[in-house]
Regions:
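N-terminal alpha-helical scaffold/docking segments in eukaryotic complex subunits
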Residues: 1-67, 170, 180-181
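Residue-level detector of alpha-helix boundaries and kinks
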Residues: 3, 15, 19, 58, ...
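Structural detector for internal amphipathic alpha-helices that build alpha-solenoid repeat scaffolds
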Residues: 4-8, 20, 33-40, 67-82, ...
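Amphipathic alpha-helical scaffolding segments comprising HEAT/armadillo-like alpha-solenoid repeats
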Residues: 41-61, 80-94, 112-124, 143-155, ...
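Short inter-helical turns and helix N-cap capping residues of alpha-solenoid HEAT/ARM repeat scaffolds
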Residues: 65-66, 96-97, 126-127, 157-158
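Hydrophobic, well-structured mid-protein blocks that either form specific transmembrane helices
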Residues: 88-107
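TPR/TPR-like (Sel1-like) alpha-helical repeat modules
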Residues: 151-160, 170
Length: 181
């Protein structure tokens, strides 16, 4: 994916940037390189700019990267997908950084991937945003037994987790065509 970094629309939305990258380089290549970022690999400065935009420029200018390249790799999979990256996304659900786990939950929901067991484990995550997004994703991909695990989150101390659990249960009841008792 060689390109001139000045060609990257740094201030465009992530979806717009990735759409342009897909047009230029192909969806499979963008998804593959995004998965490599998610797995902790270096995909070069230009690709980091495509997925991270202006914030990535800060890292290239010396700010600590922390977990951001992995988050951007996962987020890119919302916009560019290839089935070959599913196992990397599954592994991302157990990443040590909560923001990575949260974004991977979002991708699982968007791509409707059958990672229910991994999502159920995240219902007990120490970070409320991860629990909320795991519950939300289970609304899209969970089965009846997993719905019962989501139901327990209706008593979570965090209101956003409770809201997402309630919404997921409604979706599950419709998807599964049965009440969740």
């Amino acid at each position: 994916m060689p390109t001139d970094a000045s060609d990257v629309p740094l201030d465009a939305s992530p979806g717009d940037r990735i759409a342009i990258a897909v047009t230029r380089f192909g969806e499979a290549e963008v998804a593959d390189r995004a998965a490599a970022l998610l797995a902790g690999h270096n995909e070069g400065e230009e690709f980091l700019l495509w997925v991270g935009g202006r914030h990535a420029q800060g890292i290239l200018d010396g700010a600590p990267p922390l977990y951001w390249p992995e988050v951007w790799g996962a987020r890119t999979l919302l916009y560019a997908w290839d089935d070959s990256v599913a196992s990397t996304l599954r592994a991302g659900l157990s990443n040590r950084a909560w923001r990575v786990r949260e974004m991977c939950c979002r991708v699982v929901a968007a791509r409707e991937l059958a990672f229910g067991a991994e999502l159920v484990a995240l219902l007990a995550d120490e970070t409320a945003r991860v629990r909320a997004n795991a519950a939300r994703a289970l609304g899209f991909v969970g089965d009846f037994e997993q719905a019962l695990a989501v139901k327990a989150l209706l008593k979570d101390p965090d209101i956003d987790v409770r809201r997402q659990a309630g919404a997921a249960l409604k979706l599950l009841a419709v998807r599964l065509a049965r009440p969740i008792d």
